[in-house]
A protein has these predicted regions:
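Signature of multi-pass transmembrane helix bundles
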Residues: 2-47, 54-244
Length: 247
């Protein structure tokens, strides 16, 4: 037993620590954890909506739609918060402007994931005519797309900063204004990239990732021994990286 522990400490632990400390994985972990307060509060309202007491549904019927709102604007659009949080953490590791990086990531994610719906004729009391943004694509179903958009956006921003392809303002300009103009070229590149991919080429990053992961989901969702073993392995693997696997 002591020999096994020695091997784990000397060979396995350093490799695992190196993986867990990888810049992008650390940003993903910390970015997701940063929205934990919103997740917890939003989940409480789900409990309030589903209390298993006879007659409870009738009791809350007048305010049921209102009770659902906090969940919809926390967990229901969690991909927006995650993209901002991951970009913020990754930018911090690169000594980039965190706030600007977060905004760029959110813009990139929204452009790459959401296609506005055009309602030409509204229905009174139901929906008004105009362009609507479906929030279903902003939930956990687009989480992988949000992660990818955040990483790509920050890496593009870093590339422009390192190559000094930025608009430089005079010394007397406030830092907030200077940082905003410095991010102008990266913003153009990020927005154009995701716009071309999603709206000109019609390529949905989130859907593509879901399709690629579909075989894995099939194995994990099945009742086979392989599915059970793989599920446990992935849970433990994410724990090693500092990410709560079941969550």
């Amino acid at each position: 037993m002591s020999k096994i522990m020695t091997i784990l400490e000397e060979r396995v632990a350093p490799a695992v620590n190196k993986i867990g400390g990888q810049r992008h994985l650390r940003a993903v972990r910390n970015g997701i954890i940063s929205m934990l307060p919103l997740t917890i509060v939003g989940s409480f309202f789900v409990i309030f909506l589903n209390v298993p007491i006879p007659g409870y549904d009738e009791l809350i019927a007048p305010i049921k739609a209102s009770l659902d709102i906090p969940f919809r604007y926390t967990v229901g659009i969690m991909s927006i918060y995650v993209s901002f949080g991951i970009a913020h953490q990754l930018a911090k590791s690169y000594n980039l402007d965190e706030l600007t990086s977060g905004f760029l990531a959110v813009a990139g994610f929204l452009i790459s994931s959401v296609v506005p719906t055009q309602v030409s004729k509204g229905v009174e009391g139901v929906i008004a005519a105009g362009r609507w943004m479906p929030i279903a694509k902003l939930s956990a179903s687009s989480l992988f797309g949000a992660i990818l958009a955040a990483i790509i956006s920050v890496e593009i921003y870093r590339f422009f900063k390192e190559k000094d392809i930025v608009i430089k303002m005079p010394d007397g300009v406030p830092p907030a204004v200077s940082n905003s103009f410095a991010a102008l070229f990266p913003a153009i590149a990020i927005i154009l990239l995701f716009w071309v991919i999603r709206h000109l080429l019609g390529f949905d990053i989130s859907e593509a990732l879901s399709t690629l992961l579909a075989p894995l989901k099939g194995i994990l969702a099945g009742n086979s021994l392989l599915g059970g073993l793989l599920t446990v392995f992935l849970i433990l693997f994410f724990w090693v990286l500092g990410i709560h696997g079941p969550a």
